[in-house]
């Protein structure tokens, strides 16, 4: 009887094995169907190896978005902090990003030089960053604009740039920070003329046409008693996001001797977190202070 039972089990297993092989063969045949040739039309967008991959996103038609949502001019700290929160979320989700820089309605994300994330496909870098950022913007909106409902979903476009050396990467980030300074100085003077002097936007634009940075600083100081150098660093320098070790102090119950049972103690632990900085990244000082960003092992 035992032998007969074993024979039945063996026959059952053999039949199952045959069925499984047929299913696998059928699956392979279906996967390699006659329609598979359409994959040949996909463009190869692999980023060059051993280069810094940068994804820069910009708000789409954000002038209109800012007007519709009553952004404060020339700078709305709520909007800037929201942008930074979204960028931090992106970095926490995509840990191959070593540094990010943001100003106004744009953010640039720099991936590790040796990152092999999604086989270095540019489309993957761009779509993951932009989609994560856009969804975070909507998700965290109410945390920063409590009294202003989101009237319609914001849009962001993105691009991928590849830089072959540390110097070209530093020059790129310097360019973006220089752009922040130029735009913010202009906007600070422009809105002072509109809001405090009563000029129309067109009149303010004509007043500033052809002026240099020194001229704009003079207008601010002589007419509005504003020293541009005293404006918040976040407005003048933008925001740099880097990974840093941070000590966190939390209070929790710890198992202690009986006489101290039920006591709570402060526990300090070190975590690596995304930290915002408002500093100058043009020149060598920043990079000497944070050499790990350009480490060859990145």
Curated annotation (Swiss-Prot):
It catalyses: a 5'-end ribonucleotide-tRNA(His) + GTP + ATP + H2O = a 5'-end phospho-guanosine-ribonucleotide-tRNA(His) + AMP + 2 diphosphate + H(+). One of its GO terms (cellular component) is mitochondrion. Binds 2 magnesium ions per subunit. Mg(2+) 1 binds at residues 58-59, 105. GO terms for biological process: response to oxidative stress; stress-induced mitochondrial fusion; tRNA modification; tRNA processing. It holds the Pfam family Thg1C. It is found in: Cytoplasm; Mitochondrion. GTP binds at residues 58-63, 104-105. Keywords: Cytoplasm, GTP-binding, Magnesium, Metal-binding, Mitochondrion, Nucleotide-binding, Nucleotidyltransferase, Transferase, tRNA processing. Mg(2+) 2 binds at residues 58, 105. Gene3D superfamilies: 3.30.70.3000. GO terms for molecular function: GTP binding; magnesium ion binding; tRNA guanylyltransferase activity. Its EC number is 2.7.7.79. Its cofactor is Mg(2+). Its main location: cytoplasm. PANTHER family: TRNA(HIS) GUANYLYLTRANSFERASE-RELATED. Belongs to the tRNA(His) guanylyltransferase family. Homotetramer. Interacts with MFN1 and MFN2; functions as a guanyl-nucleotide exchange factor/GEF for MFN2 and also probably MFN1. Adds a GMP to the 5'-end of tRNA(His) after transcription and RNase P cleavage. This step is essential for proper recognition of the tRNA and for the fidelity of protein synthesis. Also functions as a guanyl-nucleotide exchange factor/GEF for the MFN1 and MFN2 mitofusins thereby regulating mitochondrial fusion. By regulating both mitochondrial dynamics and bioenergetic function, it contributes to cell survival following oxidative stress. This is Probable tRNA(His) guanylyltransferase. It comes from Bos taurus.
């Amino acid at each position: 009887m035992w032998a007969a039972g074993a024979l039945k089990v063996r026959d059952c297993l053999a039949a199952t094995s045959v069925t499984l092989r047929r299913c696998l063969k059928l699956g392979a045949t279906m996967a390699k169907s006659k329609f598979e040739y359409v994959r040949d039309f996909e463009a190869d967008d692999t980023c060059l190896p051993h280069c810094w991959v940068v994804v820069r996103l910009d708000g789409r038609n954000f002038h209109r978005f800012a007007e519709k949502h009553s952004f404060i001019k020339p700078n709305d700290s709520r909007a800037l902090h929201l942008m930074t929160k979204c960028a931090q979320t992106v970095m926490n989700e995509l840990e191959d990003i070593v540094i990010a820089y943001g100003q106004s309605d744009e953010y640039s994300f720099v991936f590790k030089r040796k990152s092999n994330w999604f086989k270095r496909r540019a489309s993957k870098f761009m779509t993951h960053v932009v989609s994560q950022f856009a969804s975070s913007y909507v998700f965290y909106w109410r945390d920063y604009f409590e009294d202003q409902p989101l009237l319609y979903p914001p849009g962001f476009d993105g691009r991928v740039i590849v830089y072959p050396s540390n110097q070209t990467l530093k020059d790129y980030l310097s360019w973006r920070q220089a752009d922040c300074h130029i735009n913010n100085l202009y906007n600070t003077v422009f809105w002072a003329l509109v809001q405090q002097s009563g000029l129309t936007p067109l009149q303010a634009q004509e007043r500033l046409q052809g002026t240099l940075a020194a001229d704009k600083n003079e207008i601010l100081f002589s007419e509005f008693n504003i020293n541009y150098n005293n404006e918040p660093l976040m407005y003048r320098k933008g925001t740099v996001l880097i990974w840093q070790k941070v000590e966190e102090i939390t209070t929790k119950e710890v198992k202690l001797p009986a006489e101290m049972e039920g006591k709570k103690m402060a526990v300090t632990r070190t975590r690596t977190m995304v930290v915002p900085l408002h500093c100058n990244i043009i020149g060598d000082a920043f990079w000497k202070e944070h050499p790990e960003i350009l480490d060859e092992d990145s």
